[in-house]
Amino acid sequence: MNLRDISGNAFPELKELLLSEIGAIEIGGITADSRKAAPGSLFVAVAGTKADGAAYVKDAVAKGAVAVVSGHAVEADVPVLVVTDPRLYLSLAASRFYGKQPDTMVAVTGTAGKTSVASFVRQIWAFAGHAAAQIGTTGVIAPGREDYGALTTPDPVTLHALLAELASEGVTHAAMEASSHGLDQRRLDGVHLSAAGFTNLGRDHMDYHPTIEDYMAAKMRLFDTLMEKGAPAVIFADDPWSDKAIGAAREAGLEVRTVGRNGQYLTLKRVEHFRHKQMIEVHHDGVIFEVDIPLAGDFQVANALVAAGLAMSTGVPAATALKALEKLVGAAGRLELVGQTKNGALAYVDYAHKPDALENVLTSVRPFTSGRIITVFGCGGDRDKGKRPIMGEVATRLSDIVIVTDDNPRSEDAATIRSEVMAAAAGALEIGDRAEAIRHAVSMLSHGDTLIVAGKGHEEGQIVGSVTLPFSDHEQVRSALAELEGSKI
């Protein structure tokens, strides 16, 4: 493929240059990482938070890059294309270069619930007979493959290479998570979406976004920029930010489909909570559906409704989509039951690492907890510091016993992070060693108690400094339970 074809016509400033012999340069690959440049490749110099890719142009050219794209003029021994938005160029160019995508794709954004919704949509599609995949925080799951561990929204080159690979493998449907970072950094531009969803908005990524309004605006790029007019936007209607999402979708010319108690497309009329499931009554188009969802928590009902709405918006009949909800399997590390003691105390692992998510999890287990809620959690380093005391307050308000421990301290001092959480966690215990904190919590479990180990969920490593050490909350909980005679794992 030549440079003219890869560039397309989205950048008028390149028109004359691409009509010259420069446009005929053959491109054999595309990258924004100078270390991955190879003979015949196109290097796109993207400015990051810590470094500007333009500083590595010479390195990329030395490795064989035959052209460079930059946001400003740079010296190079190869043609340089200057564009207003290198990130956007990278995404659109990657989309053209790799070409193929699954025929039906949806993306979901929101502070919490993205992974579960993407997982549920995949499961509903599969139930309906489609070859379906999900892409997001827990990795890539598709027929015949489970690749765990990835960014919520992969970089554009990785993403489009993956989409082409999935399409070649026969995947026809794919559900993606759309993070605010990914949307703001143009990583999803060039993805052909059939429908999009919004779950909720709460405090997160305040180290990246200057205000909550900026955070919401980044989320809404999914509606106002990436979707074609008339496409369905499935919005959970019961969140404080739902009206703003509805307004953004309508202003973008999308077909709004709301779900939840205040929803018009899927109206939740009744919920009955049981220990490991919930019975819901949902109305759609004059028909009443009673559905047993095999998952606990109001937040899972919300996630299931958004997922059903997305599946229905991509051609799955309502009866099929809602029937599929009865077969759902929770996403890895999302209120996942790991085991129980011989006296019936339950031990869960959950990814909740934001105030709203932690509150949702703890309020969800209260109805079936006759004893105490014991919570083990910490906060990550090099991330939004403002949420640390908020999470400490949430944990102590909604738990009977709280143990504050280490999460992924990264480059920060772990003790300092814990102290910032403890400042608002009156009466909490502090045990820095996460494995020891989990063992101590398990040893305290009595009849009717519920243990929540929050923050890391599906992760299989703990980031200390620049090193990722092997660590799994699941394994630590199982190990601690194994030390208790008669526990079920």
Swiss-Prot record:
Keywords of this entry: ATP-binding, Cell cycle, Cell division, Cell shape, Cell wall biogenesis/degradation, Cytoplasm, Ligase, Magnesium, Nucleotide-binding, Peptidoglycan synthesis
Pathway as given in its UniProt record: Cell wall biogenesis; peptidoglycan biosynthesis
Cofactor(s), names only, from the UniProt record: Mg(2+)
UniProt-listed InterPro entries: Mur-like_cat_sf, Mur_ligase_C, Mur_ligase_C_dom_sf, Mur_ligase_cen, Mur_ligase_N, MurE/MurF_N, UDP-N-AcMur-Glu-dNH2Pim_ligase
Residues noted as binding ATP in the record, renumbered to the chain: G110, T111, A112, G113, K114, T115, S116
SUPFAM superfamilies, A to Z: MurD-like peptide ligases, catalytic domain (SSF53623), MurD-like peptide ligases, peptide-binding domain (SSF53244), MurE/MurF N-terminal domain (SSF63418)
Single GO molecular function: ATP binding
Amino-acid positions noted as binding meso-2,6-diaminopimelate in the UniProt annotation, renumbered to this chain: R383, D407, N408, P409, R410, G455, E459
Compartments (UniProt record): Cytoplasm
GO cellular component: cytoplasm
UniProt-listed Enzyme Commission number(s): 6.3.2.13
Domain of life of the native organism: Bacteria
Pfam families: Mur_ligase (PF01225), Mur_ligase_C (PF02875), Mur_ligase_M (PF08245)
Motif Meso-diaminopimelate recognition motif boundaries: 407-410
Function: Catalyzes the addition of meso-diaminopimelic acid to the nucleotide precursor UDP-N-acetylmuramoyl-L-alanyl-D-glutamate (UMAG) in the biosynthesis of bacterial cell-wall peptidoglycan.
Stated family: Belongs to the MurCDEF family. MurE subfamily.
HAMAP family: MurE
Protein name as annotated: UDP-N-acetylmuramoyl-L-alanyl-D-glutamate--2,6-diaminopimelate ligase
